[in-house]
Amino acid sequence: MVGALAAALLLASPAQTATVRVPVANVWEAPDAGHLPLDPHVWPTTAVSYSQRLALVGHMPTQVLYGERVRVLARQGGWAKIVVPDQPSPLDARGYPGWVRSWQLGAAFSAPLVVTAKVARLPNGMQIGFGSQAPAGVLPAAATRRLPVTRADLVETAKHFLGLHYLWGGLSRWGYDCSGLTWAAYRAHGITIPRDADAQFAAGRPVTLTQMLPGDLLFYEHPVVGHVAMYIGGGKMIEAPNSRSEVRIVPVRTTDFRGVRRFLGV
């Protein structure tokens, strides 16, 4: 009874703003990820085997990067229940929900700049990646330069990660899932779209295949919408397909095709 009361009080306390203070914090469905064969102190910034990547399916829906703000709703046994405001989701109007290890969070800093270089190094030696955030003046200007908001530049940003291993829930230069790749590419250009493929499909403006332009997103269903790719022109698309594959460019597929959605110039 006492434990249940304590948990209820934690959940009832006002949400606090915190900032991720590790290169990548994995967001878990529940605070029981200790059984997975991963060392949170070094992963995912080290090599991950296929079996380890497969073990994430259904357990780790997303990630948050260094400097990204989260709202802490509760703390429980070394874990923090959070929502991520910059990752819109129908699961919670406040942002993508999940659990991270409490030690991966710290005090928020003001006026962060988004890292648009593939990798950058903080003064303390920590290596952070594309999409992370850091206070102004901490990194060289070239590492946080503002990217133009054009279709061609959006496609080039996605192409930076060709050959990168697919990672379920991945949202960093160490691995993307399908919607993580599209979310990260758009966000680098100042456009926030929902985190998951089905939510991206629901939020975008419908266009036809004949109207499709580079940067538009193509969606596929099996049987519900569960995969997204970005059109790059010339009848081709870039995608992060599955745990056995890497980010790749392939011809546009019509099998299981559900529709095209537009976020740029809607």
Each language-model region and where it sits:
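Bacterial N-terminal signal peptides
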Residues: V2-L10
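Aromatic- and glycine-rich peptidoglycan recognition patches
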Residues: W43-P44, T144, R205-P206, I232-V266
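Short, basic/aromatic beta-hairpin or loop at an interaction surface
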Residues: P31-Q52, F109-V119, A185-A199, I232-G235
